[in-house]
Amino acid sequence: MRKLAVIALAFFAGGCTEHAPGAGPADAGGTLVISTTADPGTLFPPFVINVQAKQITEQIYDYLADVGPDLDTRNEKGFRLGLSDRWRWSGDSLTLAFHVNPRAKWHDGRDVTARDVQFTFALNKNPALGGRMGTELANIDSVTVTDSLTAVFWFRARSPTQFLDAAAQLLILPAHQLEKIPVDSLREGAPPPIGTGRFRLRKWDKGASVEIIADTSNFRGRARLDRVIWSVAPEFTTAVTRLFSGDADLFDALRPENLQQLARYRNVRTILLPGMDYAFLRFNLRDPMNRARPHPLFGDRDLRRAITMAVNRGTLVRSVLDTFALVPVGPIVRAYPTTDPRGAQLPFDSARASRLLDSLGWVRRGVDGMRAKNGRELAFTLIIPTSSMNRIRMGPLLQEQLRRMGIRVQLEQLEASTEGDREARGAFDAALGG
């Protein structure tokens, strides 16, 4: 697992924009074109890290059960059925048995079995794969199979997230397609996805578009839409233009200034929804030149705290997103009913930040007032994906706030896939994530 630290900067109140849909059975069929600012990068669930990939893979594959519309993960009764049609807890709440829906089939016609569930867990836990699910699965000791349709999760300890961890963290993968492929080969590139979802992959033109089509024989019934296309425009302005010109039906990242243009486009309407996003400043805790060593700056916890206190998050949020976002309570979505808004946070306190930097030996030098220690200037590079206009605008504001504190920040804008690759390899100092 990569070791990172983050300062949560903004929680987006959201803006889901779409052409007005019809209603009733006559509205079934057709194509939905979604304008988006980044390519998914991968459609192999263990490696999914961006929103686009998550949106697509969740249509192709299924969880055993999924979080319901109220987003309450505390009560399993609020979860929606997925591949499992029922489940049963043991008396001590340390085992959870899922029964796979016997009607569920893979897109190639093969039956879904409990072995697929067991294989999916083992693959995601395999350190040789280097997937992203280590933390989420830490409390699950193992998965066993009692019959062809029953998979049993064995937990290390009771916790409030047991059901969520077992039911809705893993998109179930086909053992018959993947289990004979060496893990190293899966890391280099997985085969085309075979899922159980109500859509199957038709075409992926990397960097341009992804198209999925309805699985007409799906065990839950055919999807209402015939197909969905994600149209990739790496530049934010291009993505918005596709919506307004009618080349796309939906864009879910409108900014406040875009709302002023809506009066000219009667075929487009806006729906404001609580957002599921937050932006954050991510510190790399390992040295990009040698991952065995701590980062020469951010390996110091007190330095990270000083930088955190030097950032006025409220000003950043208001300047970039006006009233359409809130300062988050941490790296968590406010829309979740489990989010406690009273959580303790480091405050914006420039005087305290300055004193802490001085005590660490980072003192102001020269006419420009930049801080230095043992001949090294307190400076780092911040990478920003060009797919996010919010983060592009936030970068210079953050840069200026830290300059006033004597910290030099160099901004580096990168195409989204390049930025994501840099983060995955640990080849960065800090990043604006979201």
What kind of feature is each model-predicted range?
Residues 85-130, 146, 152-154, 230, ...:
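Aromatic- and charge-enriched surface segment that lines or borders ligand/interaction sites
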Residues 99, 134-179, 319:
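Surface-exposed binding/hinge segments that line
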Residues 34, 109, 268-269, 403-434:
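Periplasmic binding protein-like
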Residues 187-190, 215-261, 301, 396-400, ...:
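Ligand-site clamp/hinge motif
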Residues 211-216, 297-400:
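Append "and occasionally in soluble cytosolic enzymes with long acidic Gly/Pro-rich linkers
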Residues 68-74, 167-223, 227, 237, ...:
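Gly/Pro-rich hinge or "lid" segments in bacterial periplasmic/extracellular proteins
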Residues 35-91, 122, 192-196:
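N-terminal lobe/hinge region of extracytoplasmic solute-binding protein
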Residues 16-19:
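Bacterial signal peptide processing site
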